[in-house]
A protein has these predicted regions:
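Short beta->alpha junction loops
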Residues: 60-61, 111-113
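Mixed-charge interfacial surface used for oligomerization/domain docking
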Residues: 3-4, 10-18, 22-27, 32-33, ...
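Class I S-adenosyl-L-methionine
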Residues: 35-103
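Short active-site oxyanion
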Residues: 1-4, 80
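Conserved residues at beta->alpha junctions
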Residues: 85-88, 113, 230
């Protein structure tokens, strides 16, 4: 039986991967205005609106019916499906997928325990496993183990958006705001951790490199993806240059993409993100 990959729209993917999967969108709200993530608003338009608007956007999870629509398509095509969602600790989207899956056979829901590029690299690994001829169940079993090794580290321009979205405490946000320092965060096992605070992007970039080393380094045999939030990729390109010893001779090409609307709502513009499987 052929297997398709279904993901929610918070998984940040490069175009060639995006073409191979089926996406269930979440919803972004600017006040009374409602947008379907990746459908009625693209990343560029979202960040332009985020920067210009006085209204903090909010997000809504995908519903069981949203997933059921995709599951029905898989059923009609005679295909099994592996469903990869953002961390259940961040959103009820995973729960929605599980509720919908209860009405279908051969649907396997995986809580990525990650977000953005972290979910994205798990999707890439899923496609790789299927391309290698793994069965649906074999692929699911491997993915459930490998997701424990996903590390996402991010240098944010500010903690303000995370605070306003209720993702971190006001005390942590205040600490990040002192002297306009840039916070370095990690996402592991569905939780956000403040790793350190840097005065300026260069020190922040050094902290990102330090955290990669702290977790034991990168498994270069598995997918790696970098990302940025906002309209310009200049900060990310500066990070790549500053951290060149990590990548030199190990990657033919450093791949990166933009952080999508839903996660961008909480990260704000000006973030640099690195997602990888640790050794």
């Amino acid at each position: 039986m052929k297997t398709r990959i279904i993901v929610d729209s918070t998984a940040d993917l490069v175009p060639e991967v995006q073409k191979r999967v089926h996406i269930v969108p979440l919803t972004v709200h600017f006040g009374q205005e409602e947008y379907v993530d990746g459908v009625t608003i693209d990343h560029k338009a979202f960040y332009e609106k985020l920067i210009e608007s006085d209204v903090l956007p909010t997000t809504s999870q995908a519903t069981p019916n949203d997933f059921a629509v995709e599951f029905e398509k898989a059923k009609e095509a005679g295909e099994a499906a592996i469903v990869i969602t953002l961390a259940s600790k961040f959103s009820g989207t995973c729960q929605s997928a599980m509720i919908a899956a209860g009405n279908y056979e051969n649907i396997y829901v995986i809580d990525s325990t990650s977000v953005a590029m972290g979910s994205g690299i798990l999707v890439e690994l899923a496609l790789r496993l299927l391309d290698e001829g793994k069965s649906t169940k074999e692929a699911v079993q491997i993915l459930e183990e490998e997701k424990k090794k996903i590390v996402v580290v991010a240098l944010l321009d500010t903690l303000e958006y995370l605070k306003r979205g209720g993702r971190i405490s006001k005390a942590v946000a205040f600490a990040g705001g002192v002297l306009k320092i840039k916070p370095v965060l990690s996402v592991t096992d569905g939780e956000i951790h403040l790793l350190g605070k840097a005065r300026g992007s260069k020190m922040g970039n050094n902290l990102l490199v330090q955290e990669i080393n702290n977790v034991g380094g990168i498994d270069f045999g598995k997918p790696i993806l970098l990302g940025y939030s906002g309209i310009s990729d200049a900060l990310l390109l500066k990070y790549i240059e500053d951290s060149r010893p990590i990548w030199s001779g190990r990657l033919e090409k450093i791949r990166y993409t933009t952080v999508g609307s839903v996660i961008g709502t909480h990260a704000g513009p000006g973030a640099v993100v690195v997602a990888f499987f640790k050794n």
